[in-house]
């Protein structure tokens, strides 16, 4: 614990930016990083991890520090607790592999427990024979006191990587000797280093995020080049803008053009314009941006040396992807399966059961590593943001007095932009989560609620002040960025900017499923763009708009045609029609470009409008049917968004307008992004800061602790037992907190009523919790209120059940073949099943509704990569469940579990 506190105190802003406390540089001082000079020696390794050895006759008596990184707070479970038994370790030696030795035998010693287990990927790792004295096994990596064989290293004890020079050189040595002034070091080969790093990962969230980032970035070269290009674009925009503003003598250009004298760019450039013409404020701004670029370059250097190289070796030697080009074609599921095959070679994830009895309790809290758990770790923070947006915890709408027409455009759907989204995530993530990716312990304690709310509100206000100060510079930068980026596209295809649509940032969070990785989500949205455009184009536009566009298209086309023909006819050596000024300082080329652009825009709009007419239906290769309802249902197969409020109105213009708020014009999104740079400070100060208390309540109430995984968002675990926390429409409307006493009394009433109605206990709990949170009238006051409340419960529950949709989609994308087939069968049964009748919780009547989740989703087959997480009937820890009978559950149980874990630290 003292070691962890010391590391926490040394943690600074720059250390976190540059990754100085990363999992890749938590090694000893004597550890030598990977050197590319030893690549040529891989031919001597013969496919093994350690196929050669280093001979020596003596050893060094060095004093090693007792550093134990496994005791750090890595995953907020009992495996990282100091009170838990010591974790087993394996010595890392360099003796030559013995082919006749049984590599599957595990040897134990009472003085230093360790374990080892073979895997298909590293079958060449042998094990040590049993020794009476294993005190110095950590030193046997280089110092060979006894014959030893290769095994996997663990980080429980410090290891010595130095040795005195041998008497004679050995041709079998795979460690490259480095000459130093006073000592010699040996470089570990890449494959051994990859194994060592994987065996000693202490922050699994950071490592898996880096693995996914490397996969999504298509390798180290593409990641480095992409980040360099971004910095070059920033530097080009700054330098080119300053050059155009203060580096060219435009007065001399205008005077020389009237004299018809030949002028070159060299004549127009002002010498020493940076020191003489550029204002001091602009120089300070350029200095600040230059410092930012330097920091980004330093960060890229650290990431390249300490992250990207290590991840590349990990993919190459352990995942089995020697070439980064294969990352563009390989599926993420294949990488997940290969990661799971390596779990027995990591001290946090090993599930070896052939261990002595004293280690059984320690193995119960091992880090979980399957497809669901990997997605939960990568999406730990994003899952909370998805739930925040879907439950409408954040109030982002603005209301300007005396401007009611403008207020309709300043709703949550239009105000939430990339800039505001980045500021909100920056304030929340750095406040809620610690450096290990886990939720801070004080956030989960109820008595800290008011203090945390004030601190988070102060963070939002500080971010508002910073955005207000940087607003002028950021606005100029983004205007230039969008102009340079989209002008060429607009010039080649004018309709690409004014006619194309894309999903808004608010829609991206609204449509995203829990545990859905970014590349799956982007693919799903891209598949929906075509059907969404077809659905919108089926609705006819206003008659005024259509006729006006026809007139403008005809007039602009006629004028453009006449100007082009006149230029071709009258242009010769004596007369230059293209430079003829139709108006003052406006030549014919200017008007040809202007009217040609108008004609292209109106033509593309009319083409999309008239593409569904009877004249064009016969010319289309594929059959087309005018059916907006069927088109929207087809779009919902990709967006997974079809609220029950749209039922019976899918063909109406109102539903189409609501869908267009999600799928908006691209030019409108760009304008909103620019306006957001001005509105973000006011939204952060007046709106988001007022939601600080609701944000703290959300993280406390919807965070559950999973043994071996830590605290995660409730909805990401796909737990269908507690329906009161599911995505209901009525819960989104509740903003105030209910006292715990009334909630506890409601639970007691619900439990007393459940004795006579055991078949209806789940819906009864839903009704009681919903009545408390929504502050509805008590169901026992009158029979009329019972009927209304029960009807609302069923309608709200089945209106937008996002957690169930996320569960089904996760099975389709990340499950095995059997799981995918099971999910497709159940989804087809759900679509084909007629509405069933569900019993009301408070009476014997029934209402029409959809089947419950327990009927929709069947248990998955065993022996699959997702069996432990995707089966809703799966128990995470059977031994812990047996020992915890009679314990409290729900919120009180979660708090009790948290305090127990907090004491064990």
UniProtKB/Swiss-Prot annotation:
Gene Ontology BP, a term: protein localization to phagophore assembly site
Taken from the UniProt entry, a GO cellular component term is: endoplasmic reticulum membrane
Segments of skewed composition (Polar residues)? 823-835
- Report the subcellular localization: Preautophagosomal structure membrane; Cytoplasmic vesicle membrane; Golgi apparatus membrane; Endoplasmic reticulum membrane
- Basic residues biased stretches: 733-755
Which residue ranges are recorded for the region named Disordered? 55-132, 731-795, 821-851
User: TM segments?
Assistant: 228-248, 273-293, 550-570, 589-609
Keywords of the record, alphabetical order, are: Autophagy, Cytoplasmic vesicle, Endoplasmic reticulum, Golgi apparatus, Lipid transport, Membrane, Phosphoprotein, Transmembrane, Transmembrane helix, Transport
Instruction: List the stretches on the Lumenal face of the membrane.
Output: 249-272, 571-588
Q: How does it sit in the membrane?
A: Multi-pass membrane protein
Coiled-coil annotation reads: none
Which residue spans are embedded in the membrane without passing through it? 464-484, 666-686
Domain of life according to the entry: Eukaryota
Query: Which comment does the entry carry about domains?
Result: Forms a homotrimer with a solvated central pore, which is connected laterally to the cytosol through the cavity within each protomer. Acts as a lipid scramblase that uses its central pore to function: the central pore opens laterally to accommodate lipid headgroups, thereby enabling lipid flipping and redistribution of lipids added to the outer leaflet of ATG9-containing vesicles, thereby enabling growth into autophagosomes.
Q: Which family does it belong to?
A: Belongs to the ATG9 family.
What job does the chain carry out?
A: Phospholipid scramblase involved in autophagy and cytoplasm to vacuole transport (Cvt) vesicle formation. Cycles between the preautophagosomal structure/phagophore assembly site (PAS) and the cytoplasmic vesicle pool and supplies membrane for the growing autophagosome. Lipid scramblase activity plays a key role in preautophagosomal structure/phagophore assembly by distributing the phospholipids that arrive through ATG2 from the cytoplasmic to the luminal leaflet of the bilayer, thereby driving autophagosomal membrane expansion. Required for mitophagy.
What protein name is recorded for this chain? Autophagy-related protein 9
Q: What is the lineage of its organism?
A: Eukaryota, Fungi, Dikarya, Ascomycota, Saccharomycotina
């Amino acid at each position: 614990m003292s070691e962890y506190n010391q590391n926490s105190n040394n943690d600074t802003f720059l250390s976190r930016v540059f990754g100085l406390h990363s999992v890749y540089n938590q090694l000893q001082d004597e550890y030598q990083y990977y050197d590319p000079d030893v690549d040529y020696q891989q031919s001597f390794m013969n496919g093994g991890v350690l196929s050669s050895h280093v001979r020596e006759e003596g050893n060094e008596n060095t004093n090693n520090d007792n550093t134990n990184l496994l005791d750090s707070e890595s995953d907020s479970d009992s495996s990282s607790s100091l009170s838990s038994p010591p974790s087993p370790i394996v010595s890392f030696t360099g003796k030559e592999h013995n082919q006749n030795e049984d590599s599957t035998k595990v040897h134990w010693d009472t003085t230093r427990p360790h374990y080892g287990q073979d895997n298909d990927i590293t079958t060449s790792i042998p094990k040590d024979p049993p020794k009476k004295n294993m005190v110095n096994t950590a030193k046997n990596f280089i110092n060979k006191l006894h014959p030893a064989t290769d095994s996997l290293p663990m980080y429980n004890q410090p290891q010595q990587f130095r040795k005195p020079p041998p008497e004679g050189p050995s041709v079998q040595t795979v460690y490259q000797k480095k000459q130093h002034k006073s000592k010699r070091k040996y470089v570990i080969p890449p494959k051994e280093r990859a194994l060592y790093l994987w065996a000693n990962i202490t922050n699994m969230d950071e490592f898996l995020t880096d693995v996914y980032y490397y996969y999504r970035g298509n390798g180290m070269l593409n990641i480095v080049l992409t980040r360099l290009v971004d910095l070059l674009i920033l530097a080009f925009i700054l330098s080119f803008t300053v050059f155009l503003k203060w580096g060219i003598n435009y007065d001399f250009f205008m005077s020389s053009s009237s004299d018809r004298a030949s002028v070159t760019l060299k004549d127009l450039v002002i010498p020493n314009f940076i020191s003489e013409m550029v204002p001091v404020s602009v120089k300070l701004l350029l200095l600040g941006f230059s410092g930012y670029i330097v920091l980004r370059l330093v960060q890229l250097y650290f990431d390249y040396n300490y992250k990207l190289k290590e991840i590349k070796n990990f993919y190459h030697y352990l995942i089995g992807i020697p070439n980064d080009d294969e990352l563009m074609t390989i599926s993420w599921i294949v990488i997940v399966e290969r990661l799971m095959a390596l779990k027995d070679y990591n001290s946090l994830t090993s599930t070896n059961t052939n261990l002595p009895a004293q280690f059984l309790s320690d193995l119960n809290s091992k880090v979980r590593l399957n497809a669901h758990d990997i997605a939960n770790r990568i999406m730990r923070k994003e899952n909370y943001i998805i739930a925040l947006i879907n439950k409408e915890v954040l109030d982002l709408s603005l209301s300007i007095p005396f401007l009611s027409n403008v207020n309709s455009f300043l709703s949550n759907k239009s105000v939430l932009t990339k800039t505001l989204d980045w500021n909100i995530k920056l304030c929340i993530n750095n406040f809620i989560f610690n450096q290990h990716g886990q939720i801070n312990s004080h956030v989960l304690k109820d008595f800290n609620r008011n203090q945390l709310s004030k601190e988070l509100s102060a963070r939002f206000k500080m971010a508002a002040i910073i955005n207000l100060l940087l607003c002028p510079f950021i606005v100029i930068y983004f205007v230039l960025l969008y102009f340079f980026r989209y002008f060429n596209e607009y010039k080649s295809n004018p309709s690409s900017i004014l006619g194309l649509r894309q999903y808004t940032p608010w829609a991206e969070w609204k449509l995203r499923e829990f545990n859905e990785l970014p590349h799956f989500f982007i693919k799903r949205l891209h598949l929906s763009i075509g059907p969404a455009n077809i659905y919108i184009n089926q609705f006819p536009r206003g008659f005024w708009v259509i006729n006006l566009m026809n007139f403008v298209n005809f007039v602009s086309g006629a004028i453009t045609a006449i100007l082009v023909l006149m230029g071709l006819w009258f242009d010769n050596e004596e007369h230059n029609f293209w430079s003829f000024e139709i108006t003052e300082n406006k030549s014919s080329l200017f008007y040809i470009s202007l009217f040609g652009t108008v004609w292209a825009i109106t033509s593309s709009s009319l083409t999309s409008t008239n593409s569904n007419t009877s004249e064009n239906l016969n010319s289309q290769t594929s059959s087309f049917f005018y059916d907006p309802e069927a088109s929207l249902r087809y779009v919902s197969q990709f967006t997974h968004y079809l609220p029950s409020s749209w039922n019976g109105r899918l063909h109406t213009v109102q539903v189409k307008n609501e869908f267009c708020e999600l799928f908006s014009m691209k030019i409108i999104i760009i304008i909103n992004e620019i306006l957001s740079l001005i509105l973000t400070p006011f939204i952060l100060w007046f709106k988001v800061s007022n939601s600080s208390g609701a944000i703290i309540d959300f993280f406390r109430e919807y965070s559950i602790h999973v043994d071996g995984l830590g605290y995660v968002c409730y909805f990401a675990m796909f737990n269908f037992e507690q329906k009161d926390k599911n995505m209901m429409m009525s819960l989104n409307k509740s903003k105030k907190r209910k006292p715990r006493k009334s909630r506890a009394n409601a639970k007691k009433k619900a439990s007393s009523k459940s004795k006579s109605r055991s078949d209806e206990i789940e819906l009864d709990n839903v009704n009681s919790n919903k009545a408390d949170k929504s502050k509805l009238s008590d169901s026992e006051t009158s029979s009329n209120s019972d009927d209304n409340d029960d009807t609302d419960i069923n309608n709200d529950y089945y209106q937008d059940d996002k957690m169930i949709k996320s569960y089904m989609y996760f099975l389709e994308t990340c499950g095995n073949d059997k799981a995918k087939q099971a999910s497709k069968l159940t989804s087809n049964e759900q679509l084909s099943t007629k509405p069933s009748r569900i019993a009301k919780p408070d009476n014997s009547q029934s209402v029409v509704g959809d089947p419950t989740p327990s009927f929709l989703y069947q248990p998955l087959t065993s022996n699959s990569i997702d069996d432990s997480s995707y089966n809703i009937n799966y128990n995470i820890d059977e031994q812990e469940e047996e020992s915890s009978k009679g314990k409290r559950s729900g919120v009180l149980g979660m708090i009790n579990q948290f305090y127990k874990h907090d004491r064990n630290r």
